[in-house]
Amino acid sequence: EFQQFVQEVDRPVYMALAPSKTVIAERDQLIPSYVASNARTRYAGMIRDFKAAGMTNLSLDQLKLTDYFKTDHHWNIDGAASAYQTITKGMDLRPVMPSKSNRKEGEHAYYGSLARKTTLAYATSGDQLAYYEPAFFKGINVCYDGACDRPVIDESFVQQEGDYVDRYEVFLRGNHGIMSMKEQTKNDRPTILVLKDSFANPVLPFLAKSANLEVVDVRYVPKSFDVSQFAKQKQVDSVLFLHNSNIAGLMKTYENTL
């Protein structure tokens, strides 16, 4: 299916697969030898298969455990920024990095999905959720669900009190089936189709500073949705799969929509 998609879309197709925390822990020999884990082998196999289908791998192997939240499987803003730099380099885009003065930290602790699922019982302390202020992303028009001018960064998610607030939704208010992100004054930039999961959410605001984005999350589109058709309709210049490495569960969905 992926090979057919690469041929049909007739544009460069890239993949940036975030290694899971297990893959990194295994690489850094932090998992005891008596614990059975083949995460790295599976990860390498997946990348091999995607490359065989004609995609270009943008390796994110430089990521460290400190680039991820302790209480969540997602990467934090440092991991997302590192991924953005790798992607822009690999896709020949101009990176636009914020300065340290644009960085903000939520005043409330962030308990990620791993902690919330266990009713916080195992979380000795929460994470600090950092993000870059909305002003840095001014001019990027975000459209989904039939409306535009949506916030790139919605600070209400970091301002709310309560341990069960999903503060990760500060980035684009979470997941949406189809979304576009364009910087109004820049018409000469390439258009990228991004096929993503929630790992992409903190990366997309950065990426929208370098290119116009048409974004699809196949978990939230109708079964009849045709990604190849959508790519042609939007006249995209390239395609980027931006996912975490546990993509196996989505393979069936991709087979139906590509």
Where are these regions (language model features)?
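Extracellular glycan-modifying ectodomains
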Residues: E1-L258
